[in-house]
Design a protein with these regions (language model features):
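Short amphipathic alpha-helices and their capping/turn segments at secondary-structure boundaries
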Residues: 124, 173-183, 245-257
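Flexible, acidic/Gly-rich N-terminal and inter-domain linker regions that tether
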Residues: 1-88, 96
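Radical SAM/AdoMet-radical enzyme domain recognition
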Residues: 98, 132-134, 146-234
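Short, small-residue-enriched loops and turns at beta-alpha junctions
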Residues: 91-92, 140-145, 236-240
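Canonical Radical SAM [4Fe-4S] cluster-binding loop centered on the CxxxCxxC motif
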Residues: 76-118
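Short Fe-S-cluster ligation motifs
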Residues: 121-141
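Glycine-rich, proline-tolerant flexible connector loops at the mouths of alpha/beta enzymes
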Residues: 55, 86-88, 135-146
Length: 263
């Protein structure tokens, strides 16, 4: 695992990464059968084994039943409402060399970033469509899209939107706290893959290469005061079942530790 920290990176004392990686190493989807899937679908509360069974090849014959159960759970907790948001890219500069990404720092593409006036013009136009939630994104470049720049963007967004999410490079807790004071509510970070070896092969250089720092980003965001955090994997880099399993239990462990947060 590539774990040489950059000087600016904050280390936190957390056992969540160890727990997740331990569970993933033990994951074996071949040990589940149709009876395990049926049993999981009939439960009110799932164990890790139940979750694994629903992700296993044995569950492929139960897609309709799984979709129906998922719909029921969604309606139970969220009703029939749908929350809509729009993404707004502020910049596409990046400091990382990720082999699968067109934004990577070695690609010869046109780069740019919005001025504050351009941001506000975009936000004004978006808000006039009736949307009240926005997701602010950048490429992962601290030099071209620094925290102050993003903070000013969040302040502008606060004039037009009731909910503001950010999907940028991972930050330290104090930087997340600053963006929260500016008006940000939610943070999304994609781990891409939870397999450390595959992660290292796909992230050749840049801060993103440091697996632990990225993994702990959501926890730093929570300690920085963010109301909610999002998780994700780029399915296909590694074993998609393992990565889906890891994404779910990463969120589970964080919510167990911080029960007040939204996932």
């Amino acid at each position: 695992m590539a774990d040489t920290m950059f000087d600016f990176m904050e280390m936190i004392d957390s056992d969540i990464m160890g727990k997740v990686l331990s569970q993933v190493r033990e994951y074996d989807d071949t040990r589940f059968h149709a009876s395990d899937v049926k049993n999981a679908l009939g439960k009110d509360r799932l164990t890790f084994d139940d979750y694994s069974a629903l992700l296993s090849p044995a569950a492929e014959d139960f897609l309709e039943e799984t979709a129906a159960r998922a719909k029921m759970e969604t309606r139970k907790y969220f009703g029939s409402s749908i929350s809509m948001f729009t993404p707004l890219y502020l910049a596409n500069y990046c400091s990382n060399h990720c082999v699968y990404c067109g934004f990577n720092c070695n690609n010869n593409i046109r780069r740019g970033k919005l001025s504050y006036a351009e941001m506000e013009s975009e936000m004004d136009a978006i808000s006039k469509t009736g949307l009240r939630e926005i997701l602010i994104l950048t490429g992962e470049s601290r030099s071209q899209s620094n925290v102050d720049y993003i903070g000013e963007a969040v302040k502008l967004a606060k004039k037009y939107f009731s909910t503001i999410g950010i999907e940028i490079y991972p930050l330290n807790a104090d930087e997340y706290a600053y963006l929260h004071r500016c008006g940000a509510d939610f943070v999304s970070v994609y781990q891409e893959t939870y397999d450390p070896d595959i992660y290292e092969k796909n992230h050749l250089s840049g801060p993103k290469r440091v697996y632990p720092y990225r993994f702990n980003a959501q926890e730093r965001a929570v300690t920085g005061g963010m109301r909610g955090v999002g998780f994700g994997s780029l399915l296909g880099l590694g074993d998609f079942r393992k990565d889906a399993f890891a994404t779910g239990i990463h969120a589970y462990y964080l919510q167990r530790k911080y029960p007040h947060i939204e996932i």
